[in-house]
């Protein structure tokens, strides 16, 4: 069955459509939504079966982790005990916004966190009351979708709900930065350019390979 498209342009039905999408997430379904960059696909971050399904639908390698969308920057402390100064500076400057920060975890794995600056996804996170595991709305290796019709074209009956908020604001993906204590590396160039990152950090750290 083709995904249900929920139009968010009508303020009278906006809240109800957010609830419909939230209920879909809570029942293990995949939901597409606009962000301030491109359209994303998401599932509840605490649902392992839904995450497996998202990888399958996306045709994404398990080596490439999903981003975790959080509604408040303070939630970073739920994932890492020590937040490097570099991360604190970037969070203070660019969050909420189009920046994904990858941090080390105690078990030697990593987590990519993003605090988006888009009403729809923020309302959705707050409605489900858990972080959302997310990836761009395209088959792995393809171009990210920038509107609801492109999402449908990419996935059709493979996902469950599409929140149609009109064209994505930036049309380019978020910038992804891996952070160590005093070093960072740009993993993916995106909306926030290298120069803006450098100005923010004021040469207090070293950039490697970017």
Residue ranges of predicted features:
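Active-site-adjacent structural elements in enzyme catalytic cores
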Residues: 1-210
